[in-house]
Amino acid sequence: MAEKKKVEREFVEASTGKTSKGPAVVTAANKKSATGKRVAAVILWVLALAAEVGAILMLNGIWYIKEEQKMYWLIGALVIDLILVIIGSQLWKKANRLDPASKQSSVKFFLWNNMGLIASVICFLPIVILLLANKDLDGKTKKIVTVVAAIALVLASLFSIDFNPVSAEELADAQQAVGTGTVYWTRFGKSYHLDPNCHTLMRSSKVYRGTIEEAFEANRTDPCDFCALEQE
């Protein structure tokens, strides 16, 4: 049986992007970072709502646009709306991994982890309903813009849903297990590792390392089963 070729690995600091050959401990101001991301997300969602309002004003004729240009303006507003909603939702999800809500408050936990989805519905569902009810647009424009708006609603919702929400209790458990130590993860892996020499990491040429908070921010919220077993 051929011997597996040993991969030369480099370790990358998650906070700085710098590389080195040995382990290190990195601290992160996760609370401050999460607050900044949430503020930015809300600002982007407000701008997205403004784009939707602009589309509604164009649709109702309050903001005058020539009929032959109206379809392009409406689609442009919807695209801007979509981009802003998705970017805001990604920032909100990252903030939730840094500073997650507690499951003890089920209402807050639900709202915190579905805020992006709520923003998506608010920023697209009204315009979809108004398009369907509108009788002034020509048939072609109405059909195309309605389809674009519906697709945008679906895309925004899919990108905004957090399919793996993290609770404050899960983060606390991870912090207790790891302490102030360093955890490791790879670009395409789903877990964080407690041991830089875990056999599941040995074939990765680039290994990221950082605090448990940085691992959660990178959406690596599940501990490696092999590392956990070895640590017991």
Model-derived regions: residue spans:
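Membrane-interface helix-boundary motifs at transmembrane edges
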Residues: Y64-Q69, D99-S106, N134-K143
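Loop-to-transmembrane helix junctions at the membrane interface
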Residues: M71-L74, N96-L117
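Membrane-anchoring hydrophobic segments
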Residues: M1-I86
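Membrane-water interface of transmembrane alpha-helices
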Residues: I83-D99
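Final/C-terminal transmembrane alpha-helix of multipass membrane proteins
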Residues: T146-I161
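Mature, structured domains enriched in cysteine- and short glycine motifs
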Residues: L158-E232
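Juxtamembrane cytosolic interface motif at the C-terminal end of transmembrane helices
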Residues: L57-M58, S89-K93, S160
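Cytosolic-side transmembrane helix boundary signature
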Residues: K108-F109, N113-A150
